[in-house]
């Protein structure tokens, strides 16, 4: 995979940057989804028909018209059909630029963010800005399904290898939800670790859980963005397991006040945003 594209070379990610305190929409940086989809052969037609990159933004603050600081938490849904994904460090810098800028009210901030993200992503984006009090009653959730992590197996390789999924199914037709907390990959630019919980919901021939776990662990030294990893997992499962229906959903731990939770499916609606124990 060759990601040495001009759109990546210009990213602020991995570079020393200054933090702006006045609103600046030009801080947002796009990454074309085609960079990864070309290699997967899905640039024109994706095997998933429903999906979004679901972001939670915890560090949002601005000034009201009297200069009093305000804070909020945002849920952001970035449609999978957008031309670009949003590079996470640029998003953090963009959010920080609100800190010393005055806005009339919550709605003005929400509309500003939604407009700017739509322009950067070149696709549909939904932003919901919530007062902190909304989260007072929020529970720590868990993703329903059988956890595949407690298997007594020996692992000797941590290099990505989709071939772990070869011959991974039996003839038994099932509907299953499987969960692994062992998803770990590395940032494409900085090599920093990205920690996630993976949820797979499928209908089709039963998937061998040992083969699936070995495949998940093989991402451990793999360098890709969160969104790209989830699309790769979806494509690999469709290729090797050939399920009738499939959802792949990953919830990653927070970095820089942001968590990214890509969801791709060919049969399920988008989930409500939630929070897992590690988030």
Curated annotation (Swiss-Prot):
Annotated binding of substrate, by residue: 86-88, 226-227
Localization in the cell: Cytoplasm
InterPro entries, per the entry: GTP-CH-I_C/QueF, NADPH_dep_7-cyano-7-deazaG_red, QueF, QueF_N, QueF_type2
Protein name in the entry: NADPH-dependent 7-cyano-7-deazaguanine reductase
Enzyme Commission numbers on file: 1.7.1.13
Catalysed reactions, as listed in the record: 7-aminomethyl-7-carbaguanine + 2 NADP(+) = 7-cyano-7-deazaguanine + 2 NADPH + 3 H(+)
Pfam families tied to this protein: QueF, QueF_N
GO cellular component: cytoplasm
Lineage: Bacteria, Pseudomonadati, Pseudomonadota, Gammaproteobacteria, Pasteurellales
UniProt-listed NCBIfam families: QueF
Family of this protein: Belongs to the GTP cyclohydrolase I family. QueF type 2 subfamily.
Membrane-crossing residue ranges in chain numbering: none
Species for this entry: Haemophilus influenzae (strain PittEE)
Residues given in the record as NADPH binding sites: 88-89, 255-256
Gene that produces this protein: queF
GO BP terms: queuosine biosynthetic process; tRNA modification
Keyword NADP: yes
Main location: cytoplasm
UniProt pathway annotation: tRNA modification; tRNA-queuosine biosynthesis
GO MF term set: preQ1 synthase activity
Class of the enzyme per the UniProt entry, highest EC level: oxidoreductase
Quaternary context: Homodimer.
Catalytic-site annotation from UniProt: 187, 194
Domain of life: Bacteria
Function per UniProt: Catalyzes the NADPH-dependent reduction of 7-cyano-7-deazaguanine (preQ0) to 7-aminomethyl-7-deazaguanine (preQ1).
Keywords: Cytoplasm, NADP, Oxidoreductase, Queuosine biosynthesis
């Amino acid at each position: 995979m060759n990601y040495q594209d001009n759109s990546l070379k210009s990213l602020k990610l991995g570079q020393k940057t200054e933090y702006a305190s006045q609103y600046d929409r030009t801080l947002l940086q796009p990454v074309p989804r085609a960079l990864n989809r070309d290699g997967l052969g899905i640039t024109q037609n994706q095997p998933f028909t429903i999906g979004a990159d679901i972001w939670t933004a915890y560090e949002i603050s601005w000034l009201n018209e009297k200069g009093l600081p305000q804070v909020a938490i945002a849920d952001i849904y970035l449609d999978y059909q957008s031309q670009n994904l949003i590079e996470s460090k640029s998003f953090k810098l963009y959010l920080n630029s609100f800190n010393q800028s005055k806005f009339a009210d919550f709605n003005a901030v929400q509309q500003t963010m939604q407009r700017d993200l739509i322009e950067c992503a070149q696709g549909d984006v939904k932003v919901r800005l919530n007062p902190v009090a909304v989260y007072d009653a929020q529970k720590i959730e868990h993703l329903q399904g059988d956890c595949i992590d407690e298997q007594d197996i020996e692992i000797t390789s941590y290099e990505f290898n989709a071939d772990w999924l070869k011959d991974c199914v039996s003839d038994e037709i099932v509907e299953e939800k499987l969960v692994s907390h062992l998803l770990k990959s590395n940032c494409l630019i900085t090599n920093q670790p990205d920690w996630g919980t993976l949820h797979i919901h499928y209908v089709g021939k039963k998937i061998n859980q040992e083969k699936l776990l070995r495949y998940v662990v093989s991402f451990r030294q793999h360098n890709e963005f969160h969104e790209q990893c989830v699309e790769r997992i979806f494509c690999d499962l469709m290729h090797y397991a050939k399920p009738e229906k499939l959802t792949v959903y990953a919830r990653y731990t927070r970095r820089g006040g942001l968590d990214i939770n890509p969801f791709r499916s060919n049969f399920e609606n988008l989930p409500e945003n939630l929070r897992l124990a590690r988030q």
